[in-house]
Amino acid sequence: MPSFDIVSELELFEVNHAVQNTQKEIATRFDFRGHDVSIELNEKNKEIKISTESDFQCEQVYNMLENHFYKRKIDVQALDPQKATASGKNFVQVIKLKDGLDSDTAKKINKAIKESGIKVQSSIQGDKIRVTDKKRDTLQQVMAFLREQQFGLPLQFNNFKD
């Protein structure tokens, strides 16, 4: 019976490349010369830390990071920016990375599938949702339906079986 899995995975090596490209752009931009501006990725905690001298520079670096995410085809919904806080003479902004389906989001997705009226079976299996049906076309309808919805994090469809 055809099935597929709905997951929300983040490729950390792509995120790392986006952060490195942002670091290179910071080094070459004229408006950041002579200023203490840095961005670093903590893969263990899955967060990005921006440190600048002003709140405005913090916003600029965040926008640069978003642009590099777009260029690397990483969904920016995976970013969860926290409020920039002042620590000493620097502003620090922590951006948490959303990776994996939490149980609340999985329940919302499962409920949306059931309320859509598409006759499929969906079940939550840990950090993924398995959707099964007799026809591939019905599964593709579910995929199209979910792409239209906004759940606050990027969704991928994998493990498609016939």
Curated annotation (Swiss-Prot):
Q: What is this protein called?
A: Nucleotide-binding protein ABAYE0515
- Entry GO MF terms: nucleotide binding
Q: What NCBIfam families is this protein classified in? A: PRK05412.1
Gene3D superfamilies from the xrefs?
Answer: 3.30.70.860, YajQ-like, domain 2
Q: What does this protein do?
A: Nucleotide-binding protein.
Record keywords, A-Z: Nucleotide-binding
- Cited Pfam families: DUF520
| Stored CDD domains | YajQ_like (cd11740)
Q: Which residues cross the membrane?
A: none
Sequence similarity: Belongs to the YajQ family.
Q: Which GO terms describe its cellular component?
A: cytosol
Classification via SUPFAM superfamilies: YajQ-like
| Species annotation | Acinetobacter baumannii (strain AYE)
